[in-house]
Swiss-Prot record:
Enzyme Commission identifier(s): 3.4.21.105
GO molecular function: serine-type endopeptidase activity
Organism the protein comes from: Shigella flexneri
Entries under PANTHER family matching the protein: RHOMBOID PROTEASE GLPG, RHOMBOID-RELATED PROTEIN
InterPro entries referenced in this protein's UniProt entry, alphabetically: GlpG_N_sf, Peptidase_S54_GlpG_N, Peptidase_S54_rhomboid_dom, Rhomboid-like_sf, Rhomboid_protease_GlpG
Family note: Belongs to the peptidase S54 family.
Record's function text: Rhomboid-type serine protease that catalyzes intramembrane proteolysis.
This protein's record includes keyword Hydrolase: yes
Keywords: Cell inner membrane, Cell membrane, Hydrolase, Membrane, Protease, Serine protease, Transmembrane, Transmembrane helix
Segments passing through the bilayer: 94-114, 142-162, 169-189, 192-212, 229-249, 250-270
Protein name, entry field: Rhomboid protease GlpG
Recorded GO CC terms: plasma membrane
Bilayer topology term: Multi-pass membrane protein
Encoding gene per record: glpG
Intracellular or extracellular location(s): Cell inner membrane
Length: 276
């Protein structure tokens, strides 16, 4: 048994313990003068301490309260700060995250005004050999979305995952992941369905894979994704592949994006271990 930390407020201690339980780490609380948090499996100590540092930065983060709800441990002893909606958006998103979101919204509005086809003529993957040197096309397909649900779903994930990467690892890392995954997921998708596709989902899947594996292999990176969410991503890929919902999905982009994210996370976490 290893004591991780002590909290003066028992509800704060319980919130942290509940959250770590959702991550597969079992902690116990022993009440003395304060609430002492103990870890049974000492091999998980590094991961727990990394998460503790994040928790202490912002114990009011909604994910901690959500974990307490799942565990049935909510009460009035712990008071969470409340943030206005846009303040919460600003807190998590860096400049690259915002620029991408704004660009997608502007393109979406243009598609509603001018029509999908007109915008795709300018932004779609090169659909004619004469366009192969219009290099922006290899990336701008990610800006196009064909329904309100499509853009909302992708931008929510982009904000959640991309914002975390940018805040923890820097704008440069997010740009690199975005450009590589947009290029390779677009290439794969055009092999599947031709050049007439669009959406940020290939990049989103890359971020899912990157954040999950980097968090698993390098907890001190400060980024992480719950295993349940990566399982959801895999189920969604399978559902799209077998057309279970009767929806048109960019299956090639999803698979390629996820593979890119996992590969980049593996390399980055390997380099991080070598630097230690």
């Amino acid at each position: 048994m290893l004591m991780i930390t002590s909290f003066a407020n028992p509800r704060v201690a319980q919130a942290f313990v509940d959250y770590m339980a959702t991550q597969g780490v079992i902690l116990t609380i022993q009440q003395h003068n304060q609430s002492d948090v103990w870890l049974a499996d000492e091999s998980q100590a590094e991961r727990v301490r990394a998460e503790l540092a994040r928790f202490l930065e912002n114990p009011a983060d909604p994910r901690y309260l959500a974990a307490s709800w799942l565990a049935g441990h909510t009460g009035s002893g712990l008071h969470y700060r409340r943030y206005p909606f846009f303040a919460a958006l600003r807190e998590r998103a860096g400049p690259v995250t915002w620029v991408m979101m704004i660009a997608c919204v502007v393109v979406f509005i243009a598609m509603q005004i001018l029509g999908d086809q007109e915008v795709m003529l300018w932004l779609a993957w090169p659909f004619d050999p004469t366009l192969k040197f219009e290099f922006w096309r290899y990336f701008t397909h990610a800006l196009m979305h064909f329904s309100l649900m499509h853009i909302l779903f992708n931008l929510l994930w982009w904000w959640y995952l991309g914002g975390a990467v940018e805040k923890r690892l820097g704008s440069g890392k997010l740009i690199v992941i975005t450009l590589i995954s947009a290029l390779l997921s677009g290439y794969m998708q055009q092999k599947f369905s031709g050049p007439w596709f669009g959406g940020l989902s290939g990049v989103v899947y890359a971020l899912m894979g990157y954040v999950w594996l980097r968090g698993e292999r390098d907890p001190q990176s400060g980024i992480y994704l719950q295993r349940g969410l990566i399982i959801f991503a895999l189920i969604w890929i399978v559902a799209g592949w077998f057309d279970l919902f009767g929806m048109s999905m960019a299956n090639g982009a999803h698979i390629a994006g996820l593979a890119v994210g996992l590969a980049m996370a593996f390399v980055d976490s390997l380099n991080a271990r070598k630097r230690k």
